[in-house]
Amino acid sequence: GTDFENFVGSVSKIALLGGHLDVNQTGILLYGNATCHIEQDTFRNVMKGVRSTRSSQIIVDNFMNIPTLSPIEATRGIDIDQPVSTYIAENTIFNGYLGISVSGSSAGIVIRDNDLYRSLTAGNNAGINLYRIYGVSLNNRVHDNELEITGGQRAVGISMNNVQELSLIHNTIDFLQTEPLPAGYENAGISGLDVRNSRIRSNYITGSSHYSLREDNVGIIMTNGMANDLFCNETTNMYFGQRYFGPNMVTVLRENKFYDAFRGLELFSPVSLGKQEH
């Protein structure tokens, strides 16, 4: 592979002396029908590791360490928009306001076996971000990813917004704390808004002890979804195990487990309930 390190980019001398990077600093940029296999590369000191628009990409076994410099909200590990095809696997990514982000896809995506380590305090950051993802027969697959979020403050492990036909299986999300990065509020392991015809199964969300004492920390939260199956998911030490808002019609919950939650399951919408354990 190729190492991409210590990019300087088009920044002014004053900003350079201050250690700031240009917001467009990108390790690899793909645009318009590009096809690329990106494997075993190293990305350090870049605002975005890989950025792609309307292209095909296989991104495997890369290392990315995205700096926690201002503006944090502009940083990305892998940022994919309107892909022709996407396969993202076995990457190690430190930080990035969005660690892996895919938007505008109808061709089917695979995100699997990635390790994401996060220690950001900027609100609404997400490890894996999915936006406007469509498909057929559950051809979007996100599985076996491991996320560690330290000192979460309104952080999301896996965020879904306007997503259909997704199989979200066997992901592990751990919320941790240290003395300089204590447990915060309003964190979510898995968050879904307008998610439809999807299967969310066997995901494990765990918080260190203080996360269960902080209001609105939640394992799984779903809003305005439809025709989703959520089963065999397990949450531990979160203030809420699972929460459901809006219609969530034809949604089935079964065999989920909520350990050490202030409230295991909170429903503000009709769902079909199977056996749960709290």
Task: Locate each region found by the language model.
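Extracellular beta-strand/beta-solenoid scaffold signature
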Residues: 1-8, 22-31, 44-54, 67-83, ...
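Extracellular beta-strand-rich, repetitive "passenger/adhesive" scaffolds
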Residues: 1-21, 37-42, 61-71, 88-92, ...
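Short "repeat-start/strand-capping" segments in structured domains, especially the N-termini
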Residues: 12, 33-37, 54-58, 83-87, ...
